[in-house]
């Protein structure tokens, strides 16, 4: 993490300084023109291992009808419309108790047939990962077969728990999950949400997360120029950016103010658990 620079008084603007930076809003619009990165032309999945001879084991959802959970759909629609922290918390709670469908698509291989004809060998299957314009990797997941078919009618649904889907996404070096990509309620599930699902723990907004608040308090402790501090949500809903407001003693130079914020940011950067719970970090400095 790096700190934002600020002079004395209230900083003119926040500067995000999270371990993943600012990840964008909860809408999946940035992935609308995605490109697939889930497999290569040789029929390998994104881990580089052939799917030949592999079987999908029983998931515990053999009687699943593929219908989306109405409560989950409503929660996703609320976040897509107004991504407040409360709405996001409701969505993650609904998602944790539901199931998702992960798409499996044909990983075609170009083969040359007799007489020089070219055809696609689509015997291999793979789970796609997508790459957004900003370079983020994402695993698409869906609430039901209707949303999946809207995205890709040829994709096969594999039901699984959100925890298992999140663990698979992390194993594939994905940064986010995309919920119901292609729908009007599509939502990007940010890294903090991805890790919460994978670890099967409740997700909390960073500025309300006890672990994060304790970590910030420890990072600020021992800074004699800091009179008090608070943690609050950033200015842009749906980004997951947390703002740390530092109230410093009067009379500090610009360089001294920046040094304080830098030291605090560097301490926070060493806390791996905090990094998994905070999507972005900004500082605002005031004087007492």
What are the functions of these language-model segments?
Residues 1-288:
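An interfacial alpha-helical scaffold signature
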């Amino acid at each position: 993490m790096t700190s934002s620079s600020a002079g004395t008084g209230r900083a003119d603007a926040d500067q995000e300084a999270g371990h993943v930076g600012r990840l964008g809003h909860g809408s999946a619009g940035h992935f609308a023109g995605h490109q697939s990165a889930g497999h290569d032309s040789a029929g390998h999945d994104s881990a580089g291992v052939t799917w030949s001879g592999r079987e999908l084991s029983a998931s515990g959802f053999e009687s699943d009808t593929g219908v989306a959970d109405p409560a989950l759909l409503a929660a996703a629609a609320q976040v897509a419309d107004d991504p407040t922290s409360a709405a996001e918390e409701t969505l993650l709670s609904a998602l944790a108790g539901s199931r998702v469908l992960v798409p499996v698509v044909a990983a075609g291989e170009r083969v040359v047939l007799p007489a020089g004809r070219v055809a696609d060998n689509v015997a291999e299957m793979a789970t796609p990962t997508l790459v957004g314009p900003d370079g983020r990797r994402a695993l698409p997941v869906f609430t039901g077969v209707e949303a999946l078919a809207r995205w890709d009618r040829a994709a096969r649904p594999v039901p699984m728990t959100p925890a298992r889907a999140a663990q698979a996404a992390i194993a594939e070096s994905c940064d986010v999950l995309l919920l119901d990509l292609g729908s009007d309620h599509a939502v990007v599930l940010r890294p903090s949400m991805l890790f919460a699902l994978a670890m099967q723990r409740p997700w909390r907004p960073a500025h309300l997360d006890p672990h994060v608040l304790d970590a910030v308090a420890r990072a600020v402790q021992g800074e004699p120029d800091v009179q008090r501090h608070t943690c609050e949500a950033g200015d842009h809903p749906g980004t997951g950016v947390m703002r740390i407001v530092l109230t410093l003693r009067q009379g500090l130079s610009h360089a001294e103010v920046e040094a304080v914020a830098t030291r605090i940011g560097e301490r926070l950067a060493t806390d791996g658990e905090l990094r998994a719970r905070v999507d972005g970090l900004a500082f605002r400095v005031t004087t007492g």
